[in-house]
UniProtKB/Swiss-Prot annotation:
One of its GO terms (cellular component) is cytoplasm. The lineage of its organism: Bacteria, Pseudomonadati, Pseudomonadota, Gammaproteobacteria, Enterobacterales. It comes from the Bacteria. It comes from Salmonella dublin (strain CT_02021853). Homotetramer; dimer of dimers. L-methionine binds at E56, Q99, D239, K270. GO terms for molecular function: ATP binding; magnesium ion binding; methionine adenosyltransferase activity. The gene is metK. Mg(2+) binds at D17. GO terms for biological process: one-carbon metabolic process; S-adenosylmethionine biosynthetic process. Its cofactor is Mg(2+); K(+). This is S-adenosylmethionine synthase. It is an enzyme of class 2 (transferase). Binds 2 divalent ions per subunit. Binds 1 potassium ion per subunit. K(+) binds at E43.
């Protein structure tokens, strides 16, 4: 492969779509804490002064959706009306129904291992050895920039920062290997009284330089810090937010394909979420085992059917064993039936709110990031 550029973006926890994702997953977590077998599909809409939480939830649990919503918005940092959104005074509306019994009869089974998929669909998982977390570098560093923005906002280092922010990083590749960073974009909401020059200097020193490796930066690297010159109006006052609208930010930043299904607000019976996590787990273990430098997994399902309708392994010419052998290894070591992958990754716990900002992949505390099958795969493949 010749020289090329590749760009990924991320958004902060205060971005309107991410507020919605975090509320949906906070509701999911609260329900799973009481009822691990609950069926949850929770969607959220946010706009100036209001939050609407809707969807289909079937559970024995009772949760206070208004309190969960306000606490989530408060933790993000929207606590004053001058930000255009206030956790203490915003309206919280609820429109929750129950899961269709037609769907339910296709999912539940007397034998849990025969649990059917909650819907048809296709999901992808990906891993690459270009970073220590086996994720693409562009999305990894885009996430780290907005995470750092939240950190220095909350710890008081840059008290004039506000919750809404976006990042974008363009990497230079030569023959598939990173040779540098071509461009960095960071836009952050801010208080009215900070001037542009002071903001740009502070963002460079406190956010960008501590995060991006200096060996990838050079005199030709371009930096765009609040390029419009002003970002006071942000969050839900600037744009409405919806659950599930940042699916590329949530996954691989465009480096891998995406099946189209969003994650947040969905319990693990929804393969949109759980099978995408399992596909990442498979791909990461294949790369960690040294069986390939890059690996993309596709799985697909039919509603009400336990066995996947297809499994694909793509290694982009980087495989160390034949592709046919990789498929056999995946089938041998990973149970990709809906209940099997729930058990394999221990998914019936309230672990989802943390996934809802800064990416679902590449953070070691999530169970689908374990590489506990890597040595087994390596041994079975006959690699020394």
């Amino acid at each position: 492969m010749a020289k090329h550029l590749f760009t990924s973006e991320s958004v902060s926890e205060g971005h309107p779509d991410k507020i919605a994702d975090q509320i949906s997953d906070a509701v999911l977590d609260a329900i799973l804490q009481q009822d691990p077998k609950a069926r949850v599909a929770c969607e959220t809409y946010v706009k100036t002064g209001m939050v609407l939480v809707g969807g289909e939830i079937t559970t024995s649990a009772w949760v206070d959706i208004e309190e969960i919503t306000r606490n989530t918005v408060r933790e993000i940092g929207y606590v004053h009306s001058d930000m255009g959104f206030d956790a203490n005074s915003c309206a919280v509306l609820s429109a929750i129904g129950k899961q269709s019994p037609d769907i339910n009869q296709g999912v539940d089974r007397a034998d849990p291992l025969e649990q059917g998929a909650g819907d048809q669909g296709l999901m992808f998982g990906y891993a690459t050895n270009e970073t220590d977390v086996l994720m693409p570098a562009p999305i990894t560093y885009a996430h780290r920039l907005v995470q750092r923005q939240a950190e220095v906002r909350k710890n008081g280092t840059l008290p004039w920062l506000r919750p809404d922010a976006k990042s974008q990083v363009t990497f230079q590749y030569d023959d598939g290997k990173i040779v540098g960073i071509d461009a960095v974009v960071l836009s952050t909401q801010h208080a009215e009284d900070i001037d542009q020059k002071s903001l740009q200097e502070a963002v460079m020193e406190e956010i960008i330089k501590p995060i991006l490796p200096s060996e990838w930066l050079n005199t030709s690297t371009k930096f765009f810090i609040n390029p419009t010159g002003r970002f006071v109006i942000g969050g839900p006052m600037g744009d409405c937010g919806l659950t599930g609208r940042k699916i590329i930010v949530d996954t691989y930043g465009g480096m891998a394909r995406h099946g189209g299904g969003a994650f947040s607000g969905k319990d693990p019976s929804k393969v949109d979420r759980s099978a995408a996590y399992a596909a990442r787990y498979v791909a990461k273990n294949i790369v960690a085992a040294g069986l390939a430098d890059r690996c993309e997994i596709q799985v697909s399902y039919a509603i009400g059917v336990a066995e996947p309708t297809s499994i694909m392994v793509e290694t982009f010419g980087t495989e160390k064993v034949p592709a046919e052998q990789l498929i056999l290894l995946v089938r041998e070591f990973f149970d990709l039936r809906p209940y099997g992958l729930i058990q394999m990754l221990d998914l019936l716990h309230p672990i989802y709110k943390e996934t809802a900002a800064y990416g679902h992949f590449g953070r070691e505390n999530f169970p689908w990031e374990k590489i506990d099958k890597a040595q087994l795969l390596r041994d079975a493949a006959g690699l020394k």
